[in-house]
UniProtKB/Swiss-Prot annotation:
Keyword Ion transport: yes
Source species, domain of life: Bacteria
Protein name: Maltoporin
Organism: Vibrio cholerae serotype O1 (strain ATCC 39541 / Classical Ogawa 395 / O395)
Reaction equation(s) it catalyzes: beta-maltose(in) = beta-maltose(out)
Amino acid sequence: MELTMKKVSVIAAAVAATLAAGSAFAVDFNGYFRAGTGISGNGNADQAVNKAGTGRLGNENDNYYEFGFAEELKTGEQTWKVESMIAQGNSGANGWEDGDFNVAQFNVQAKGLLASDQEAVMWAGKRYYQRKDIHITDFYFLNTSGTGGGIENLSVGNQKLSVALVQDGDNTNSSGYIFDARLANIGLWENASLELAMAYNFATEKDSKNEVADDGVLVSAILHQGLSNGFNQTVFQYGTAGYGAQAANFWGAGSYYARGTEAFNDASGFRLLNWGVINLGENWEMGHQLAYLAGSDIGGQFGGDGANKNTYTGKSFDIDQYSVVVRPMYKWNDTMRTVFEAGYNAGEKISNGGLATEDFGNAKFTVAQAWAMGDSFWARPELRVYGTYLLDTENDKAFGDDDTEFVVGIQVEAWW
């Protein structure tokens, strides 16, 4: 009995210590999710077409969740941040759906370790690493996230330098890595700054193995202009080899480098992006995306699920495309708004199992009645009821027996 009481006392003391620590260091609960459903005219439930090029409003047919927990622990002049996040996505077709939970983040970031630069941060673990995206299209144009480590926000004059090494895949022949270097806060004219980034993707070959894919480099220049009524950002990116193929498409840029194929060894590509959000009077706000993407000597790959999947066809192509997306929003009051979004994406893509190219064209028009916790363009949570009209300008059979489709749906989006 005495031994049992001692065990209970130890447990009680541990619980008390945990509660005391919680009162001193509050855990930060953060995250993002979207969920919704729609009914389409062809009877195939919800529909979504090329949201990176035509806009995401009323054009997402999935549920996606991110739940993160972080805590900052202070000791003297140092701050240690422990960060974690799980993520999961599914179609939302049933009330209970199986799916793997991904540990999207699990890392430690320590600030104040360098006496000469108290703002510099050393980190290691799995992390969303300084991702760059355009919200209205859900397009991450620079994303080298993964497991690794580095140091960021090193002071170089008035600029901030960050360097990192992140693993990027593993196959039977090699292991891939990204060396990421960035210089931010380069002052230009009034309210304007420049950030330069370089990602070098390389591989280490395993014993007696040969990696056929060449290493690639992606360079980015991001010009941010603050405005009295919002902001504008212009991005130029240039990539070689596997990064050349990424830059010529809306595939993201940074991770998931193509290894195990020589299809992109001679490739080069670039992107020119412009996006931003501005106020247009007391009741109107608008976001936009303008994009032009092009690539040279992009190799074709066999499709399907056979033994030749992703194998180089021996044919290479020059491709390009452009995208225009606008999202104006009218605010009726502090909660209710009507949101419009129109987008068009067209160009030339590799098709026919990597043996030819073809023209493509997608258009989307959405009207949504929405209610949000605040009147800002960025206010969330937001409930939406929407109608979306989809058009494929090059394929008469894109939606069953038609080149058009109409979707009515409801969605919630939140971040905190």
